[in-house]
């Protein structure tokens, strides 16, 4: 097992590059199953556990996958299996993305119900309902989604998502791209990763209108073609690094980033007193000595993202006043709060709202990661804490942050990765 050891109290400064988006990469990797021949090549793919998990899943169903130096190539002409097994899907919820491409191209799929971060219910019913509306027969059996189409394959349909869902929107887009007729999606997700998936599919030959709006119209085509493409930036990694600068009262510049993807996040940094400037591909943040409190409501894009909620709670422990953070997307996503309180935070949770009382001096301690973004929040707190903080079980972190400790060290953080024996007996003194 590995942990991160952090000696806090040092302001961050310098320049660092932002990695390619994990969430975008996973979606377009699944889309690479749609062409019947050739090789799709994707640049700027982050070297993450989730990327390797999906790569292995694609290999199991027969795709040829090569990953080297942040470039991923996928040849899907020889797919011979249509099952995504539990052993892989349990590791990552995004594995369900193969459902739409397999159904759209082959008319059949067997996908284990997914795993991933454990913070409350995140049902897959929207995915299943959409596939049924496109004409698939679906049953749940022995922990699997078993889906088949009629002889004619999928057919276009009108689908109104009752809640905005990135995963369901992406999966339905990929299935509808090869369906017969026209599919209309309403209340579709607006996230940059969905916009980029639409553009990626269009480049493959799909016909999609309404890109960047909540209403998407997909005219099915007979065939899609392999392409070469560059992945977009990871806006959540960017937001996390900016929060690291703010919580340490530092000054950093991020490069290879699209500020337009972080509009709501940047507005909140300005609200707490940070100076923020941008170019087309860079963001500079300078934090004040005294941070102001800020209330946040996590909502679907373009509002403040739920994937920054945990980091914002950590940051608000160092703001001068009371902040309230409401999560309207994942209402039970507060596993990080008890661990932040172990470091000295004063945070209470009621229903889907956390109330943070700052400024609270933080002190180093051992804390336990419970999920991906919780891990990031504990690192931020450790950077601000007096003394040494040990963040255990950082395998959660490795699902979504590429060498985050190296990037933080480049900015001056005193942070290192160590191995430890989780079951070792403590030494009594």
Curated annotation (Swiss-Prot):
Source organism = Chloroherpeton thalassium (strain ATCC 35110 / GB-78)
Subcellular location(s) of the protein = Cytoplasm
Pathway(s): Cell wall biogenesis; peptidoglycan biosynthesis
Catalyzed reactions? phosphoenolpyruvate + UDP-N-acetyl-alpha-D-glucosamine = UDP-N-acetyl-3-O-(1-carboxyvinyl)-alpha-D-glucosamine + phosphate
Carrying 2-(S-cysteinyl)pyruvic acid O-phosphothioketal, the residues are: 117
Protein name per the record:
UDP-N-acetylglucosamine 1-carboxyvinyltransferase
- Membrane-spanning parts: none
Identify its protein family. Answer: Belongs to the EPSP synthase family. MurA subfamily.
């Amino acid at each position: 097992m590995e942990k991160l050891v952090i000696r806090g109290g040092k302001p961050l400064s310098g320049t660092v590059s932002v990695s390619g988006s994990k969430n975008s990469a996973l979606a377009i990797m699944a889309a690479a199953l749609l062409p019947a021949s050739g090789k799709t090549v994707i640049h700027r793919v982050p070297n993450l556990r989730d990327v390797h998990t999906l790569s292995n899943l694609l290999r199991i169903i027969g795709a040829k996958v090569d990953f080297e130096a942040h470039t991923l190539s996928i040849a899907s002409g020889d797919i011979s299996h249509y099952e995504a097994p539990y052993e892989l899907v349990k590791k990552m919820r995004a594995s369900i993305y193969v459902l739409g491409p397999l159904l759209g191209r082959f008319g059949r799929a067997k996908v284990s119900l997914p795993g991933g971060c454990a913070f409350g219910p995140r049902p897959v019913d929207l995915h299943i309902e959409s596939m049924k509306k496109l004409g698939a027969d679906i049953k749940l059996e022995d922990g699997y989604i078993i889906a088949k189409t009629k002889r004619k394959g999928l057919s276009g349909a009108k689908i109104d998502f009752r809640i905005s869902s990135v995963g369901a929107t992406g999966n339905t887009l990929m299935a509808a791209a090869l369906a017969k007729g026209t599919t209309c999606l309403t209340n579709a997700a607006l996230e940059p990763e969905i916009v980029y998936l639409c553009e990626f599919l269009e480049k493959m030959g799909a016909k999609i209108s309404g890109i960047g709006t909540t209403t998407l119209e997909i005219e099915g085509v007979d065939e899609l073609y392999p392409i070469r493409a560059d992945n977009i930036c990871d806006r959540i990694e960017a937001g996390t690094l900016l929060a690291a600068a703010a919580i340490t009262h530092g000054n950093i510049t991020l490069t290879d980033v699209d500020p337009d993807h972080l509009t709501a996040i940047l507005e909140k940094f300005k609200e707490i007193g940070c100076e923020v400037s941008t170019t087309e591909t860079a963001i500079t943040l300078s934090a004040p000595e005294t941070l102001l409190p800020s209330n946040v409501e996590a909502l679907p894009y373009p509002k403040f993202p739920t994937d920054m909620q945990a980091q914002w709670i950590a940051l608000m422990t160092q703001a001068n006043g009371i902040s309230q953070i409401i999560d309207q997307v994942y209402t039970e996503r507060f596993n990080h709060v008890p661990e932040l309180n172990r470091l000295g935070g004063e945070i209470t949770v009621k229903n889907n709202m956390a109330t943070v009382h700052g400024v609270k001096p933080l002190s180093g301690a051992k804390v336990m990661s419970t999920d991906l973004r919780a891990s990031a929040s504990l690192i931020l707190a450790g950077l601000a804490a007096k003394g040494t903080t040990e963040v255990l079980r950082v395998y959660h972190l490795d699902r979504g942050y590429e060498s985050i400790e190296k990037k933080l060290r480049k900015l001056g953080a005193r942070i290192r990765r160590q191995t430890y024996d989780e079951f070792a007996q403590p030494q009594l003194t």
